Structures are given as C-alpha cells and as structure tokens.
Amino acid sequence: MVFALVCASCGRDLSEVRYRLLIERQKLSDVLRNLTHMCCRLKLATQIEPYRNLTVQPLLDIN
C-alpha cells in the first residue's frame, strides 16, 4: 500500500514527483528545479532520500 505524498504547507499532491524519482530515476536536484513552491521543495529535500522512504508501509494493528 502506497500513501500519497502531500505537502503539509500547501496541500499539493507530490505523487508525480515521487514517480519521477522512483520510476524514471531522475536525480533529486533535477526534480527540485522543476518545483515552483518553496514549501514543496523543502519537503522533498528534507524528508525524501532518493530510492528510499518513497513508500510508506502502514503499521500493523496488533489489537
């Protein structure tokens, strides 16, 4: 299960950006150049490592 990547500041869906990083294997610096909103660029630069942490696995309910 993959959750949508959403900017917490502006609410923009960043799933297309995640697709470019993961599937098209573009560099993070190249992808950041195409983003116009500074808050989205900051989120990607600080919370995503390329090819890692791009999918979020849901926690298992142990109850």
UniProtKB/Swiss-Prot annotation:
The DNA-dependent RNA polymerase used for intermediate and late genes expression consists of eight subunits 147 kDa, 133 kDa, 35 kDa, 30 kDa, 22 kDa, 19 kDa, 18 kDa and 7 kDa totalling more than 500 kDa in mass. The same holoenzyme, with the addition of the transcription-specificity factor RAP94, is used for early gene expression. It comes from Molluscum contagiosum virus subtype 1. This is DNA-directed RNA polymerase 7 kDa subunit. One of its GO terms (molecular function) is DNA binding. Its EC number is 2.7.7.6. It is found in: Virion. Coiled coil: none annotated. Induction: Expressed in the early phase of the viral replicative cycle. Its main location: virion. Pfam families: Chordopox_RPO7 (PF05864).
